[in-house]
């Protein structure tokens, strides 16, 4: 499923508080963006126990229970983890990864909040979650009957909200500082090949690994840090993260270059740092320069003016990296008006610098 509108982490918390008490909610989203953690946090916030069932590992009898003979009749005894006396949050994770038979077993539980003769305690909440088919995850077609029994939302990662959470949770400062500079690296679409990719979960995993090594007597070696980074996040992001850590003593380098107080690193040994700073420069331009030139304010006008000279300086150091700053990448391109000015002004800037 691909819904036309998305919600952030904070919006999901508000939505669950207002909707899930009345109707079951299904959360769609890519792997690793925090669906399970947000449901657990919601349960904690409302003071309810959270019981998680993993749809991909369930059989129908795990839900409806087993029959019990009572005189001349029988009834199904629901499993203990579901049949509770106090209200709770029932979280059906990977619901769209279970078989059609299991989906059918969930019908009455989701729609009527009952299994056979057992009814969920008053005040209980039912929430489902699952990955999307375009994410390369193992999913099955969800029946229309099941879809129609739930309210659907699509969750996306929000960098600012994740950083707020990360600071409170003690995520390693290398990670938070890096994502602050490269917010576009918090999440990357799942790749077609079998390799790690960046998600809030994988950055959290990298943070835990770095903190585990840092707790020892010896500082973490460059080789081990390289292994940890490339084993956790997207290869491109891992390489730039390593360059960022290498330059950690001057994490404000890009701002200093923009202000004219520093220059791009030009030594061959600093080529990885140059690439990271150039990528950060491109990301800054994409985020801050408006598509319509009429929307420029004083700050963005100064940035655009300074950016032309910076691209000229980059071209003197490494033409390929300078081209990377202005080229189309992942369907993202710099504003057309800015590119026209680059083509118009760059020869003059180069001649002036000779």
Question: Where do the language-model regions lie?
Answer:
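Long, positively charged, glycine-interspersed low-complexity recognition regions
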Residues: 298-354
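Detector for Asparagine
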Residues: 2, 6, 10, 18, ...
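AAA+ P-loop NTPase catalytic core and its hallmark functional loops
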Residues: 1-181
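Conserved short hydrophobic patches within well-ordered secondary structure
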Residues: 106-110, 275-277, 281, 321-326
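Context-gated lysine
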Residues: 2, 35, 41, 68, ...
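Alpha-helical lid/collar subdomain of P-loop NTPases
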Residues: 168-319
């Amino acid at each position: 499923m691909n819904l036309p509108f998305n919600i952030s982490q904070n919006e999901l918390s508000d939505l669950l508080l207002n909707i899930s008490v009345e109707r079951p909610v299904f959360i769609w989203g890519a792997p690793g963006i925090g669906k399970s953690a947000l449901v657990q946090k919601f349960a904690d916030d409302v003071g309810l126990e959270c019981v998680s069932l993993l749809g991909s590992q369930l059989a129908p009898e795990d839900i409806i229970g087993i029959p019990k003979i009572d005189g001349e009749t029988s009834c199904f005894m629901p499993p203990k983890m579901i049949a509770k006396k106090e209200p709770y949050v029932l979280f059906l994770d990977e619901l769209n990864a279970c078989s059609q038979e299991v989906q059918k077993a969930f019908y009455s539980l989701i729609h009527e909040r009952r299994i056979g003769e057992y009814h969920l305690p008053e005040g209980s909440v039912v929430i489902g979650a699952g990955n999307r088919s375009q994410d390369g995850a193992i999913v099955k077609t969800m029946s229309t009957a099941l879809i129609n029994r739930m309210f659907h939302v699509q969750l996306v990662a929000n960098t600012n909200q994740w950083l707020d959470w990360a600071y409170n949770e003690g995520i390693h400062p290398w990670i938070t500082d890096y994502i602050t500079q490269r917010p576009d690296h918090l999440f990357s679409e799942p790749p077609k090949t079998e390799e790690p990719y960046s998600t809030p979960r994988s950055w959290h995993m990298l943070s835990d690994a770095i903190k585990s090594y840092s707790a020892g007597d010896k500082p973490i070696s460059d080789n081990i840090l390289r292994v940890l980074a490339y084993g956790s996040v997207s290869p491109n992001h891992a390489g730039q993260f390593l360059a960022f850590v290498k330059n950690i003593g001057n994490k404000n380098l890009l701002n200093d270059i923009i202000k004219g107080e520093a220059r791009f690193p030009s030594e061959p040994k600093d080529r990885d740092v140059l690439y990271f700073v150039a990528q950060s420069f491109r990301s800054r331009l994409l985020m801050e320069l408006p598509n319509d030139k009429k929307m420029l304010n004083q700050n963005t006008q100064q940035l655009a003016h300074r950016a032309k000279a910076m691209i000229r300086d980059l071209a003197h150091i490494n033409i390929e990296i300078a081209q990377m700053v202005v080229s189309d990448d992942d369907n993202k391109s710099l504003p057309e008006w800015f590119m026209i000015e680059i083509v118009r002004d760059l020869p003059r800037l180069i001649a002036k610098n000779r």
